[in-house]
């Protein structure tokens, strides 16, 4: 079948700007994201689209590489994981290339923050999860970065210090938007710092 593909060229302004350009040109009722070094398994979209039939689900992600479901997430009786803001503040899930969501997400939550270079996808997921229904499937549907682990390898995610700044900014944003209270804000700021120190230790061990 003939594919309706639009190729857009623009100067490199970061991943958020590139994604936003694509989002602004998209015309369908559903939107899926795919980064340049990632790969969907053939049945990815057909598996995820079935979950939109219920009507109340707005955003569907899935697992990638060797990811496993862990605290604070668990599979519910309907066979998927409910993703909420507080859970995302504990642990970010839903790699960008696993995401499919309804167009109304853009109308309700806007676009990626083009001024934020690190953890910008997590920032957007948090905004979405606050007032839209987001789920994650217990299925590995995407291969990212050639299957490499996400910590300690080349690429944006290897810059742990900048990732930490992005994570702290995300918590600040959630507080400024009124999505979390003062006690939650203090707790998640400290918790993020502990996770950062843990990552540093892991990287030193791996090297």
Locate the predicted segments by residue:
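Conserved nucleotide-sugar donor-binding catalytic segment
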Residues: 24, 78-163
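Acidic donor-binding segment of Leloir-type glycosyltransferases
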Residues: 1-9
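Glycine-rich, basic loop-to-helix element that forms the pyrophosphate-binding segment
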Residues: 10-26, 47
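C-terminal subregions of glycosyltransferases and related glycan-biosynthesis enzymes
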Residues: 71-73, 123, 130, 135-207
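Acidic donor-diphosphate engagement hotspot in glycosyltransferases and nucleotidyltransferases
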Residues: 19, 40-45, 56, 120, ...
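Short aromatic/hydrophobic "clamp" motif used to bind/position activated sugar donors
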Residues: 31
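The conserved acidic donor/metal-binding loop of glycosyltransferases
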Residues: 35-39
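Conserved donor NDP-sugar-binding/catalytic core segment of glycosyltransferases
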Residues: 43-73
């Amino acid at each position: 079948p003939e594919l309706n593909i639009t190729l857009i060229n623009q100067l490199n302004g970061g991943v958020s700007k590139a994604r936003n350009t694509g989002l602004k040109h998209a015309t369908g009722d559903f939107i899926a994201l795919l980064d340049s070094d990632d790969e969907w398994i053939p049945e990815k979209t057909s598996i995820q689209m079935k979950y939109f039939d219920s009507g109340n689900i707005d955003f569907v992600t899935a697992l990638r590489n060797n990811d496993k479901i862990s605290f604070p997430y668990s599979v519910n009786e309907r066979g998927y994981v409910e993703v909420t803001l507080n859970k995302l503040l504990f642990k970010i899930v839903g790699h960008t290339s696993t995401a499919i969501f309804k167009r109304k997400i853009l109308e309700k939550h806007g676009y990626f923050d083009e001024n934020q270079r690190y953890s910008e996808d997590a920032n957007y997921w948090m905004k979405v999860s606050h007032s839209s229904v987001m789920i994650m499937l217990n299925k590995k549907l995407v291969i990212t970065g050639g299957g490499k682990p996400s910590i300690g390898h080349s690429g944006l995610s290897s810059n742990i210090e900048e990732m930490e700044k992005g994570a702290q900014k995300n918590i600040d944003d959630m507080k400024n938007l009124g999505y979390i209270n003062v006690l939650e804000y203090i707790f998640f700021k400290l918790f993020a710092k502990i996770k950062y120190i843990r990552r540093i230790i892991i990287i030193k061990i791996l090297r």
